[in-house]
Amino acid sequence: MIEIERIRAALTKRPRFADRVFTEEERRYCFSRPNPAQHFAARFAGKEAVGKAIGCGVEFMWRDIEIAGRPKPSVTLSGKVAELAERFGAGDIDLSMTHSKGMAAAVAIVQSRGTQGPLNQAV
């Protein structure tokens, strides 16, 4: 969950923020919407949720997780995040994103491929 205003401020004060965090396709989509900050915030929350669900926390290249699609978001992994997902036995990723006037949130569920790995261990 993230405050939309934090993303709006980052987009305004740090011109390279969008380039560092979002893929070209994500930027194109968000900037085409009437209120880009809320769409960027939802995708930011989505990336964070996916990273945590896979098991890499928030220590990853943000652009290694791309969120596309409307109305149902789809997730594409690349780079180190894709390598970790493979090693951890990650399968399909279900993602739900939402935003209100002031907040954006996301929940990610990573399904196991049924192989050995951290995603298959009981907690």
Predicted regions and their residues:
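Core catalytic alpha/beta fold that binds nucleotide/phospho-ligands
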Residues: 1-123
